[in-house]
């Protein structure tokens, strides 16, 4: 998930001769890619909860219901199908109790800014956490090192680069 990045930034009609998609272009042409997508809310964190947990109650992660697993959680669906579930985020783990809450909802791991900083000491801190580059490095490393018969991976990422202040 790319916070605040409209897909128009990936289209030649918008960018002209500058191909911002780069190596992603081949995936845009061959993978499952939704060109028309509306957020569930006008806030990234609220939309995130709606998409991953399938609830409109966006404050649930720090409410009295925070420890109740929901059958509608996307991660639980993938876990039941045998996947290892991982959430990688350059933001801080404690934001709205996301780290602990997403684990309750079926994510095996929640990797946030603190874990990324420990793994990638060159990562600089920002007001929202770290740098998205290291989210992608972590995912790439996971995919490169993944071998059978290990369970397949379901990895969700959330970027923060486009969040003000830039």
Where are these regions (language model features)?
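Solvent-exposed soluble domains appended to multi-pass membrane proteins
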Residues: 1-166
């Amino acid at each position: 998930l790319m916070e605040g990045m409209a897909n128009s930034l990936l289209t030649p009609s918008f960018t002209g001769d500058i191909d911002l998609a780069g190596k992603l272009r081949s995936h845009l042409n061959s993978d499952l890619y939704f060109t028309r997508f509306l957020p569930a809310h006008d806030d990234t964190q609220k939309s995130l909860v709606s998409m991953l947990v399938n609830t409109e109650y966006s404050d649930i992660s720090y409410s009295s219901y925070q420890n109740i697993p929901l059958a509608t959680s996307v991660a639980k669906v993938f876990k039941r199908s045998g996947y290892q579930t991982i959430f990688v985020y350059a933001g801080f783990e404690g934001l709205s109790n996301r780290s602990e809450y997403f684990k309750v909802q079926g994510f095996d791991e929640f990797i946030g800014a603190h874990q990324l900083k420990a793994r990638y000491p060159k990562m600089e801190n920002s007001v929202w956490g770290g740098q998205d580059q290291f989210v992608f490095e972590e995912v790439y490393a996971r995919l490169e090192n993944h071998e059978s018969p290990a369970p397949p991976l379901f990895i969700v990422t959330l970027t923060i680069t486009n969040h003000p202040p830039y």
